[in-house]
Amino acid sequence: MTLELVERPTHALLEAARSRAEEAGLPYAGGVSPQDAWALVQSGEAVLVDVRTNEERKFVGFVPDSLHVAWATGTSLTRNPRFVRELEAKTGKDAVVLLLCRSGNRSALAAEAAAKAGFTQVFNVLEGFEGELDAAQRRGASNGWRFHGLPWIQD
């Protein structure tokens, strides 16, 4: 009975994200808030994949037990030509995959590429790990995974 109560809300989160994506004409399954992403991961219904660079994960932090497939590499953020193959090797094309980057922009591009490659349930984590820039040109003061107090660690 408790399991059903957990499954119902997370299923509803995905359906709502799909509906919003369809209305917006997004080329991937949709976007979810950091809080909804964490609920989906905790329920076991989704896998979280961090698409930031190794350097970002090392110096800024990362979500425990998240997978890592870099969308781009190095300080110049050169696109990883193996991204789709690496993602498929780690998740398969039919898993519910939540992609996380710094602010939600790169992960949206990664979600689009994955969807074009045949991933059927790939979602963007809105706001990203650090969030959007504020008026002072700093991240983390108004939104993002860390701002919401969700689990993260740093090397």
What are these regions (language model features)?
Residues 48-50:
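Structural scaffold elements adjacent to functional motifs in cytosolic proteins
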Residues 99-100:
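Short, surface-exposed ligand- or partner-binding patches at beta-edge/loop junctions that are enriched
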Residues 1-46, 55-96, 107-155:
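Rhodanese-like catalytic fold shared by cysteine-dependent sulfurtransferases
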